[in-house]
Amino acid sequence: MLSKFKRNKHQQHLAQLPKLSQSVDDVEFFYAPADFRETLLEKIASATHRICIIALYLEQDEGGSAILRAVYEAKRQRPELDVRILVDWHRAQRGRIGAAASNTNADWYCRMAQENPGVDVPVYGVPVNTREALGVLHFKGFIIDDSVLYSGASLNDVYLHQLDKYRYDRYHLVRNARMADVMFEWVDQHLVHGRGINRLDDPQRPKSPEIKNDIRLFRQELRDAMFHFQGDADNEQLAVTPLVGLGKSSLLNKTIFHLMPCTEHKLTICTPYFNLPAVLVRNIIQLLRDGKKVEIIVGDKTANDFFIPEDQPFKIIGALPYLYEINLRRFLSRLQYYVNTDQLVVRLWKDEDNSYHLKGMWVDDEWMLLTGNNLNPRAWRLDLENAILIHDPRQELAASRDRELDLIRTHTTVVNHYRDLQSIADYPVKVRKLIRRLRRIRIDRLISRIL
């Protein structure tokens, strides 16, 4: 059992985090991607002093175009608006995985700038590492005036449910001038004015190899770049703490690590890709041994954005959902005893051809973590991540919180036994062969660390 001293150490970490007081009326939950899209467009259209959009990517498709056009229109109507868009440097300059890079998002940003002379909408490319595989901009948030619209979603057709398919995420609007200022000022100082940052809407931008040294130094600087602010809330009231982190020892990682053992009754985790860092798996096992309940909601392998149906040409990236399922099966086989006693509940999300991208953590009725962090080794070590930790000691958000979780569970089925999941022998031939080949040369372990 967790000693009192150890539990106090975890609780002490949370108690010492600076917290900003939050009015319950200024926290809004959205439960569907189309609501998120409409809210984002409304906020952009009504902005009075700033629009700062941060996402992994802003895609050149119907959904992404609607957002970028709305930002241009807002700037045209109100030239005094402080407008900036930040996306990952590498992702913007390639096609989708497996597609040619002939007409990239960066090319589109340049065209939009040329088509709108006199309307300055800078699109900054943030290079978190020298190669995309080794780290991306996974910082999330849409800072508009005194509000932060927060979601793990990027901006394209499926995330915004622009057409028939959607990718399910979490969506929250937090109106809090202090938090919006803290996040905006950090982005301005460390990203917009960081070394190695260049505008993607400029066709004369440098090539990645030309800024390689700047990127390396920038990454080092990001490791130490935290949000600095004075808290104004105590531990007995509704409060928010914005967090940012890059690298294994970041404050964000430490907070996630300390948050889990503070569970008195139940921990709920959402992640789209079941590939938890070992340190978090150990936390879960300790909670189960201490008699606590743990619920994990993950996407079915067919609801993974990398899943390729058997009737389509197979690409290597299509093996990923199977690798995640292998991880989950192995995890459950170790902990089947707790599944049998209903202490551990694992749910698989699947809704027709739609995909699942939810991430986050709920500890009892007291703590909620809003984050884009996938709780995997990549998020733990390689990507620039952030989060908003909500402390709700008086359960003022209980109704919205319960509704959100009930809706997340709607399209899920409970895994009653690890054998309910397919084993490698059940996989399509091409997947089976590839996984066995990867295992022979032990590269599956490397893959699990970077994907």
Protein language model annotation of sequence segments:
Residues Y57-E62, C270-A278:
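Short, glycine-rich nucleotide/cofactor-binding loops
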Residues D188-Q189, N283-Q286:
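Short, solvent-exposed amphipathic alpha-helical segments in soluble enzyme
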Residues H10, A15-A45, D61-T263, T302-K359, ...:
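HKD-type phospholipase D/PLD-like phosphodiesterase module
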Residues A55, V87, T271, V298:
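Short beta-strand/turn micro-motifs composed of small residues
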Residues Y338-L451:
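Long, C-terminal catalytic modules of enzymes
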Residues C52-I53, L267-T271, R347:
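Short catalytic-loop micro-motif centered on adjacent basic/acidic residues
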Residues F274-L276, K301-N304, N376:
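Short, catalytically relevant binding-site loops at active-site mouths
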Residues R50, D82-R84, K266, R289-E295:
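Residues at the starts of beta-strands that form the adenosine-phosphate
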